[in-house]
């Protein structure tokens, strides 16, 4: 603050008219400001001058600065008197100029106390000795810094708790720096001042008036921190020493400790009256000097209070904080809430470097305390250092914090101090609390504490230093000496930087998003030799001219959507060089060693067409997923020491490749440096395994059911119901999942355990008790807020009985008339599709929100030329809304009730994408946009008829860009291979067609259908269901599972393989299923029940054949029996399991209800011979130590052996023993 600013403040402010003189300045101001250029001119006492108005202004600005400044200059200032206004303005101006020196000198004074001061005479019991100093000719020990040296108000910058010298250096570099500690409010300051001042007056207190005790005094309720309160009785010390800086350690050569003690004792009686008078004066002066911080608290919402410039206070309701839930973080140290990417340390857990330091010091100190306890309980004195090792989680946390501290302060390394000599620790003011032990024990404890301090300040493991003079008695002293015994000042400084009690955390901290348990790195996948998922490969279609993929920016939920606009054609990247001498075998998680520069020629979804620099033709162009570990920005190799190796084909084309690259890269664009960080961050799920939530019951869609998250793949969750192993897949943004307590809140039917229901019922009258594994509302995506219905008093606009059109939740390819059956709270309502027969129990009702994009006004289909499915009993050719409303006497919902805002989504007809089949949600299939109606998309599954199409919203979380499955390691189902009718081949390869979609029967049930009803071939097909489909009268469950023919063909002898159908669709691949060709037709009476598939969301039907019925299958003329249904009357077929290949073994497991383990046996290449050799001990590790499945398969193998050798059947039955 310069003189002109001070003058303007003085002229415009309304100052206190109370008359004071500058003899009282010490009482009012604490420490007057010292100007550097006028120190020598102020040695003589000047006449007092009444400058009350201006001093009132200055009182809050420069308090507490003279002490440290004087210490830095090496002089003992006298009382400063402003004789005129020019001096006063000079003091104000110089006070601002000396801020930098003030900060450095205060730090130097603190650390010199440890390096230069000599040991107190503890044995003489000098209790209450406040300030002692012994100096030599070269060095001078300066007074203890005031812990709150600017508490009395400096408006130049906010109060900061100084932790180490780095803080001073950081503040020196930037006066606006802020370490993240709490601002002390005026009430806090008054309490601390009055408490510490009056403590010197208490009869039983230690020391004399005006002496700083540095007691750890707990603040009253409502204050979260313990402050190290220094006594502020500056006037008493000022009177004692004859100047206004009594709390400075006076440099007195040849003065012993005992002499100083006698000096203080003599002055004690003479100054007791003055101390009593100044106790209240100091408190009142604090009220007049309440300072303000420069950070202005927001006024637009009074409930939001900043704790630091980047974080709000921790006691604020997170729902009112204007931060996205997925970007919110809570400081692990102090509970402050802020934006996650602005927090400190690599794991983003602290709101400031001060909190990070405090956590580090707490870890060190707490570990030392635990080590001390182990030491005192152990007879071996040397056991203490052994027990001081940090646990694994604390070591990880400590190293994380230390790394950030080092990175933040690396430029200030020269300012660090290191205490290496134990003898240089001086116990200044060493009696923090009354002693409760003898002098010898006290000395031992002080020595032990000093040793701990040395180890802690040196950054080593606390507890490594051992006091040379420690005795056995001292070693066995309880570790309560930290608070009940003399404590060296070094250790009390250590205690100042961490709170004594755990700070309260907001309840929702435990429920903030937890990283998804998936690989941190995007693994190398470009040249994987074996793909365990057998996913469909887009590569054959990418190069076609008419292929059009939907851009990644069309999918707001897709990984990297927010940064995809930064990518473009013509960018240069560094990519793996596959045209080299030695072809590497890249394993998952490994990084290739050879790279070269390439140019992006075309981008389709996540796929990019690239060309190596140096090629003039497209002969070596290649497609690669932009989000894998083999593509990097230009310069990545240089930072990691990897060479750029030109392709072998053109390695001799240029003599100087360096000049060539310089010319090509000049002015070129490359990937953003944080591109892959953004991709990885967007791949993390908001949910974690084990969370409980409420989701739609797929067996009764009119109710929700408690379920648990058991798997997470690419933000897709597998939910398992609480009372069964059944469940289904859905995306975390799906509207059919809800937070805990949702059903109770909106009035929806709920199926859950009894204790859960009781907890929800109790929450109706009060807040719902939240458990650790409850998925709360901030994890869910909603297109509305509950505040809309609270703040505006909004109610539902829909009325029970209204008619509208809606997407059929049981058949997403149709839009039907529907009726509002019930109106719930917060915009939710239950509707019934009128195309079905009414159900008296209401089990066919489904919950939609009034803002759902899947409901439409009456007549929407006719306006947009969409075929509407008529109500039950009406003909689609004659159905009209006018006649229907007239017949039912109902009212159509008005157009204004529907929210049909159409965003610029970017989808066009013909765009390819990947889409989840919501009739079987575990499958993600190749699909194409068949139609766009506003924001409504009709998605067609490639290779399937239109009856499998799905109407989805443009922002649906069930559609993904091309290449998404590769990115998240999810299987992609390709189009089916169409086998044309022709003469049978000698040894036809079995194939399975993808499941068929059911058609509605007359009673609303489902019956399987097949497009090729004239074919004599039998097929294994799937009954397409929905996660909300009620149980059918005929229970149909999964029997065979989709598998890859290409893999099995690669493991068969060449003579057993068959040629590919030349007329098959070239776009297909091994992700399609197989068709078992047999000689007889199938009928509906051949339906059988099998076992669950694991996901429980799809049901498959096996259509059996002729004499074999369902007991076996024929594959390449090999008999594979179903052992569970063996009938003695069945004609005997030749059974030779020794000749089975890998596929035959998988087929054997399928027909015997062990489909879930087919892939495991296939990956291990188990053929018929090896299958017969497997023992129980072999099967257990093969199946991941799962006892039940291993026991079942072991028994199947035993039955198979008995089937081959009937003579062993009797011995098998009689000698059957337990598995374990």
Swiss-Prot record:
Residues 1052-1068 have a biased composition (Acidic residues). Residues 991-1000 have a biased composition (Basic residues). This is Polycomb protein Sfmbt. Zn(2+) binds at residues 331, 334, 351, 355. It comes from Drosophila melanogaster. MBT repeats have unique discriminatory binding activity for methylated Lys residues in H3 and H4; the MBT repeats bind mono- and dimethylated H3K9Me1, H3K9Me2, H4K20Me1 and H4K20Me2 but fail to interact with these residues if they are unmodified or trimethylated. Residues 473-482, 1071-1082 have a biased composition (Polar residues). MBT repeats lie at residues 536-647, 655-753, 761-871, 879-975. One of its GO terms (molecular function) is DNA binding. Residues 1140-1203 form the SAM domain. GO terms for biological process: heterochromatin formation; imaginal disc growth; negative regulation of DNA-templated transcription; negative regulation of gene expression; oogenesis.
């Amino acid at each position: 603050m310069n003189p002109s600013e001070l003058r303007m403040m003085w002229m415009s402010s309304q100052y206190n008219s109370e008359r004071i003189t500058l003899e009282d300045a010490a009482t009012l101001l604490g420490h007057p400001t010292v100007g550097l250029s006028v120190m020598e001119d102020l040695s003589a006492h000047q006449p007092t001058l009444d400058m009350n108005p201006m001093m009132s202004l200055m009182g809050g600005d420069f308090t507490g600065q003279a002490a440290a400044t004087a210490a830095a200059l090496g002089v003992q200032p006298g009382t400063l008197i402003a004789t005129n206004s020019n001096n006063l303005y000079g003091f104000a101006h110089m006070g601002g100029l000396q801020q930098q020196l003030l900060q450095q000198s205060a730090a130097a004074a603190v650390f010199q106390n440890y390096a230069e001061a000599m040991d107190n005479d503890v044995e003489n019991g000098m209790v209450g000795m406040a300030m002692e100093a012994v100096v030599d000719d070269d060095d001078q020990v300066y007074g203890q810094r005031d812990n709150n040296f600017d508490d009395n108000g400096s408006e130049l910058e906010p109060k900061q708790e100084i932790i180490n010298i780095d803080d001073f250096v950081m503040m020196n570099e930037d006066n606006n720096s802020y370490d993240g500690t709490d601002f002390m409010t005026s009430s806090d300051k008054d309490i601390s001042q009055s408490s510490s001042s009056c403590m010197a007056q208490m009869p039983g207190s230690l020391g004399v008036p005006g002496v700083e005790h540095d007691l750890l005094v707990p603040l009253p309720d409502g204050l979260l921190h313990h402050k190290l309160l220094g006594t502020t009785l500056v006037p008493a010390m000022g009177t004692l020493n004859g100047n206004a800086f009594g709390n400075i350690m006076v440099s007195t050569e040849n003065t012993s400790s005992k002499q100083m003690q006698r000096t203080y004792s003599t002055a004690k009686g003479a100054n007791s009256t003055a101390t009593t008078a100044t106790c209240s004066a100091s408190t009142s002066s604090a009220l007049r000097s309440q300072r303000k911080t420069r950070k202005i608290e927001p006024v637009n919402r009074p409930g939001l209070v900043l704790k630091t410039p980047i974080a709000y206070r921790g006691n604020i309701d997170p729902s009112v904080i204007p931060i996205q839930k997925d970007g919110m973080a809570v400081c692990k140290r102090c509970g402050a809430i802020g934006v996650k990417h602005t927090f400190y340390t690599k794991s983003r857990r602290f709101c400031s470097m001060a909190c990070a330091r405090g956590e580090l010091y707490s870890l060190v100190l707490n570990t030392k305390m635990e080590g001390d306890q182990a030491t005192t309980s152990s007879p071996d004195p040397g056991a203490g250092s052994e027990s001081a090792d940090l646990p694994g989680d604390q070591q990880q946390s400590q190293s994380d914090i230390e790394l950030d501290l080092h990175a933040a302060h690396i430029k200030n390394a020269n300012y660090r101090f290191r205490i290496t000599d134990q003898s240089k620790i001086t116990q200044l003011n060493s009696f923090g609390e009354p002693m409760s032990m003898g002098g010898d024990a006290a000395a031992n404890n002080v020595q032990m504490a000093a040793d701990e301090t040395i180890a802690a300040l040196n950054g080593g493991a606390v507890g490594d230093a051992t006091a040379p003079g420690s005795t056995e008695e001292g070693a066995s002293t309880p570790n309560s000496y930290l608070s009940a015994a003399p404590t060296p000042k070094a250790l009390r400084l250590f205690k100042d930087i961490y709170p004594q009690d755990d700070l309260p955390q907001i309840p929702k901290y435990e429920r903030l998003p937890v990283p998804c348990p998936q690989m941190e790195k995007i693994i190398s996948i470009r040249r994987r030799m074996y793909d365990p998922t057998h996913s469909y490969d887009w590569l054959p279609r990418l190069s076609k001219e008419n292929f059009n993929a939907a851009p990644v920016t069309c999918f707001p939920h897709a990984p990297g959507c927010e940064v995809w606009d930064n990518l473009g054609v013509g960018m240069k990247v560094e990519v793996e060089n596959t045209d080299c001498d030695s072809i590497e075998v890249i394993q998952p998680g490994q990084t290739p060693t050879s790279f070269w520069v390439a140019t992006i020629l075309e981008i389709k979804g996540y796929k990019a067409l690239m060309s190596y620099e140096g090629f003039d033709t497209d002969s070596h162009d290649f497609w690669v997923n932009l989000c894998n570990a083999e593509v990097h920005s230009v310069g990545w190799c240089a930072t990691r020491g990897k060479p750029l190796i030109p392709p072998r084909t053109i390695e001799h084309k240029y003599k100087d490749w360096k000049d060539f690259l310089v010319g090509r890269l000049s002015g070129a664009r490359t990937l953003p440096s944080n591109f892959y960080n953004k991709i990885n961050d967007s791949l993390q799920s908001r949910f974690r395994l084990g969370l409980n939530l409420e989701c739609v019951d797929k067996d009764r869609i009119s109710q929700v059911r408690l379920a648990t998250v058991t798997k997470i793949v690419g933000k897709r969750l597998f939910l398992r119901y609480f009372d069964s192993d059944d469940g289904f897949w859905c995306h975390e943004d799906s509207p059919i999942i809800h937070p805990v307590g949702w059903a109770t809140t909106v009035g929806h039917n709920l199926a859950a355990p009894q204790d859960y229901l009781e907890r929800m019922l109790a929450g109706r009258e009060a807040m719902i008790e939240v458990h650790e594994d409850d998925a709360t509302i901030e994890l869910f995506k909603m297109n509305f807020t509950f505040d809309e219905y609270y703040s505006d008093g909004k109610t539902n606009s829909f009325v029970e009985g209204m008619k509208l059109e809606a997407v059929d939740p049981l058949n997403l390819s149709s839009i039907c008339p529907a009726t509002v059956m019930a109106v719930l709270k917060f915009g939710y309502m239950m509707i019934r599709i009128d195309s079905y027969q009414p159900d008296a129990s209401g089990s066919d009702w489904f919950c939609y929100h009034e803002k759902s994009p899947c409901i439409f006004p009456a007549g929407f289909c006719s306006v947009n030329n969409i075929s509407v499915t008529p109500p039950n009993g009406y003909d689609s050719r004659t159905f009209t809304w006018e006649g229907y409303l007239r017949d039912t006497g109902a009212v159509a919902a008005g157009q204004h009730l529907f929210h049909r805002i159409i965003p610029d989504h970017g989808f066009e007809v013909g765009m390819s994408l990947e889409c989840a089949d919501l009739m079987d949600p575990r499958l993600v299939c190749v699909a194409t946009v068949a139609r766009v109606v506003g924001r409504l998309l009709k998605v067609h599954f490639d290779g399937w008829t239109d009856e499998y199409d799905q109407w989805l919203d443009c922002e649906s979380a069930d559609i993904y860009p091309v290449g998404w499955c590769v990115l998240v390691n999810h299987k992609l189902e390709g189009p089916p291979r169409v086998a044309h009718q022709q003469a049978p081949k000698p040894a036809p390869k079995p194939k399975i067609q993808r499941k068929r979609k059911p058609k509605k029967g007359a009673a609303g049930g489902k019956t399987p259908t097949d497009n090729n009803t004239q074919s004599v071939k039998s097929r294994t097909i799937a009954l397409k269901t929905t996660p909300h489909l009620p149980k059918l009268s005929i229970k149909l469950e999964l029997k065979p599972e989709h598998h890859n023919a290409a893999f099995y063909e690669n493991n068969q002898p060449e003579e057993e393989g068959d040629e590919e159908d030349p007329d098959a669709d070239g776009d297909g691949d091994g992700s399609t299923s197989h068709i078992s060709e047999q000689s007889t037709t199938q009928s509906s009476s051949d339906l059988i029940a099998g076992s669950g598939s694991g996901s429980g969301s799809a049901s498959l039907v096996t259509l059996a054949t002729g004499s074999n019925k369902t007991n076996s299958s024929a594959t390449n003329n090999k008999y594979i029996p179903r052992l569970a249904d063996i009938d003695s009357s069945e004609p005997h077929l030749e059974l030779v399991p020794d000749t089975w290949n890998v596929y035959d073994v998988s087929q054997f497991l399928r027909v015997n209800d062990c489909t879930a383990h087919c892939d495991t046996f296939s990956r291990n290449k188990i053929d018929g011979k090896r299958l017969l050799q497997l023992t129980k001990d072999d099967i257990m590790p093969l199946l991941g130590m799962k006892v039940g499945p291993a026991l079942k398969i072991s028994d199947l193998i035993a039955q198979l052996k008995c089937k081959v050798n009937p003579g062993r059947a009797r011995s098998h039955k009689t000698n059957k023993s337990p598995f374990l």
